A protein has these predicted regions:
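Surface-exposed, charge/polar-rich loops and edge strands
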Residues: 1-316
Length: 316
C-alpha cells in the first residue's frame, strides 16, 4: 500500500504537551464499528463499554531512562545514545546520533567515567552495538545518568518520570512507554475487576520496532525491527480459557495487540514463551487474537496508524 494513504494533517497545537491532573480524566473517543457511532467521553467512562467476562490485556513493561548524552573520549565531541534492546550481558543495541562518527572501537564517556560505552559493531541506519563498562548495578547507574526518552513531539519536560510510566509498569526494558495504558488508575482497575472483568499482564519491551519511521513508499517494503515479548504460563492458560469461552479479548495498546497476534498466529493458540517478534500489521491482516483495542491517537504514516487502520477495516 502507498504510504500516503496513511497521511493526514495533524496540527501541532492539538498535541497535548502535559498530562491531565488525573490520568483517567483524559478524553475518550468511543467508536462502535458495528453501527458506525462515535461518542466523546472521558476515560473513566470506559468501564461502561466493558462487560462482565471481558479480558483486558496490558503490557507491563517499564521504561528505562534510555537516553544517554555523552562525549567521545578521543575528541570530546558530543553524542547521544538511545538504548533499544539488551542483547547479552552488558551489550546493548543502540540508536546513535551522530551515527557516522561512532565507528567500532569508539568510546563514549557518560558522567566523568561512571559509565563508558564502547562500540563493538556497526549496523545499518544509525544502529550500533555497544558494550557498557561501569561499577555497580547497570540500571542504578542508568537511573543516575540517563534521561527518559520522550517522543520528539513532546517539547516540555515532565515534572516527574512516573507520569511516563503506566501504574502497572513492572519489568524494566523499554525505550518508550505503552502510552495507551497511561489513562488507567489503580482505582479504575479496581472498579473494572469488581465488574467481573479479568485483567491479564503480558510483556513486550518497546524498541525501534514500535516507533521507527516508515521510509519507503510501499508499506510492503517496510521491515519491522524485532522486539522481545513474554507470555507466562499463567497468562497463556487464562487467555486460552477466555478464547474457548468466546469472551472478548481487549488489548490495551498496539504493543499488546502485536504480542497477542504474533503469539496466536504462530502457535494456533496462546503459548507461554519468551522470544522476539517483528510482526507488521497493516490493512489486509486477519486478526485472530484480539476483539477490541484501547489505543491513543497516532502519528501520520506510522506503523501504529496502519495497525489501527487494519483493525477498523477488518471489522467493517
Amino acid at each position: 500500500m502507498n504510504i500516503n494513504l496513511f497521511d493526514f494533517y495533524l496540527p501541532e497545537e492539538l498535541i497535548a504537551q502535559r498530562p491531565t491532573d488525573k490520568r483517567d480524566e483524559s478524553r475518550l473517543l468511543a467508536v462502535n464499528l458495528s453501527n458506525n457511532t462515535y461518542e466523546d467521553k472521558h476515560f473513566f467512562d470506559i468501564i461502561n463499554y466493558l462487560h462482565p467476562g471481558d479480558v483486558l490485556v496490558r503490557n507491563n513493561t517499564k521504561v528505562i531512562p534510555a537516553r544517554l548524552l555523552g562525549v567521545k573520549e578521543k575528541t570530546g565531541a558530543h553524542c547521544e545514545l538511545l538504548l533499544l534492546k539488551q542483547l547479552d550481558g552488558d551489550n546493548w543495541e543502540c540508536l546513535t546520533r551522530p551515527a557516522k562518527s561512532l565507528k567500532v572501537g569508539a568510546r563514549v564517556d557518560f558522567g566523568d567515567g561512571k559509565l563508558i560505552a564502547e562500540c563493538i559493531k556497526e549496523e545499518d541506519e544509525g544502529l550500533r552495538i555497544f558494550k557498557f563498562i561501569y561499577d555497580g548495578i547497570f540500571l542504578e547507574v542508568l537511573d543516575q545518568l540517563g534521561k527518559m526518552p520522550l517522543p520528539p513531539y513532546i517539547k516540555e519536560q515532565l515534572c516527574g518520570n512516573d507520569r511516563y510510566q503506566t501504574v502497572y509498569a513492572k519489568y524494566e526494558g523499554s525505550a518508550a512507554a505503552p502510552t495507551a495504558g497511561f489513562h488507567f488508575t489503580n482505582e479504575l482497575f479496581e472498579k473494572i475487576k469488581e465488574k467481573g472483568i479479568e485483567v491479564i499482564d503480558i510483556t513486550l519491551h518497546i524498541g525501534l520496532g514500535t516507533f521507527r519511521p516508515v521510509k519507503v513508499e510501499d508499506t510492503k517494503d517496510h521491515v519491522m525491527h524485532s522486539e522481545v515479548y513474554e507470555i507466562t504460563e499463567n497468562a497463556a492458560n487464562r487467555l486460552n480459557k477466555a478464547k474457548q469461552e468466546k469472551r472478548r479479548i481487549i488489548a490495551i495498546g498496539t504493543t499488546s495487540v502485536r504480542t497477542l497476534e504474533a503469539n496466536y498466529s504462530k502457535y494456533g493458540s496462546f503459548k507461554a514463551v519468551k522470544e522476539g517478534t517483528n510482526i507488521f500489521i497493516q490493512p489486509g491482516y486477519n486478526f485472530l487474537a484480539v476483539d477490541a483495542i484501547i489505543t491513543n491517537f497516532h502519528l501520520p504514516k506510522s506503523t501504529l496508524i496502519m495497525l489501527v487502520s487494519a483493525f477498523v477495516s477488518a471489522l467493517k
